[in-house]
Amino acid sequence: MSKVFVIDHPLIQHKLTLIRDKNTGSKDFRDLVKEISLLMGYEVTRNLSLQEIEIETPVGVTKSKVISGRKLGIVPILRAGLGMVDGILQLIPAAKVGHVGLYRDPETLEPVEYYCKLPVDVQEREIIVLDPMLATGGSANATLKAIKDRGVANMKLVCIVSCPEGIAAVQKAHPDVDIYVAAIDEKLNDHAYIVPGLGDAGDRLFGTK
């Protein structure tokens, strides 16, 4: 079973309160989502492997550590996941960025992939999947499957706000994928919105209805 990490750093929780507020405008919402993503990225990358190298400083030679091993990739789920990309890239600017787009079939209500563009060497990378909201888990599960189908074995899912239903759905479908969240909210309502949540993250990021 995958692990769930709740990142409850005071700065994240403060900024989370601001994005929950219905009076927060799109610009501030975008800035805050970026800042929260950056802060979450610190914990998401905590277990990256290191190797020791020798470098020369202005006053001598020393051994120091750098990140080694598997390369990283970032895959936002379109469109709301785009709001988290820049924050993660500030921490790992060398990461490649792919994209997965989904729409909901009006008859089956199941997510359908309409776009998937991943780095050519995606099989060699550890992939961080980004989506501000983990509600039913349908979009996350479809995205994780799409990436796995293209040969990726190592992934993490990073969401800002989640709920028990979404977490359970991802753990059932993808027990090998760890989940990182800033909050686990109470439940889903009858319209599949997280309660208390923060509304539609995509609409609030981009000022659409």
Curated annotation (Swiss-Prot):
GO terms for biological process: UMP salvage; uracil salvage. Binds 1 Mg(2+) ion per subunit. The magnesium is bound as Mg-PRPP. Keywords: Allosteric enzyme, Glycosyltransferase, GTP-binding, Magnesium, Nucleotide-binding, Transferase. Transmembrane segments: none annotated. It holds the Pfam family UPRTase. The keyword Glycosyltransferase applies. It comes from the Bacteria. GO terms for molecular function: GTP binding; magnesium ion binding; uracil phosphoribosyltransferase activity. SUPFAM superfamilies: PRTase-like (SSF53271). Its EC number is 2.4.2.9. Pathway: Pyrimidine metabolism; UMP biosynthesis via salvage pathway; UMP from uracil: step 1/1. It catalyses: UMP + diphosphate = 5-phospho-alpha-D-ribose 1-diphosphate + uracil. Uracil binds at I194, G199, D200, A201. It is an enzyme of class 2 (transferase). 5-phospho-alpha-D-ribose 1-diphosphate binds at R79, R104, D131, P132, M133, L134, A135, T136, G137, G138, S139, D200. Its cofactor is Mg(2+). Allosterically activated by GTP. Belongs to the UPRTase family. NCBIfam families: PRK00129.1 (NF001097), upp (TIGR01091). Catalyzes the conversion of uracil and 5-phospho-alpha-D-ribose 1-diphosphate (PRPP) to UMP and diphosphate. This is Uracil phosphoribosyltransferase. It comes from Alkaliphilus metalliredigens (strain QYMF).
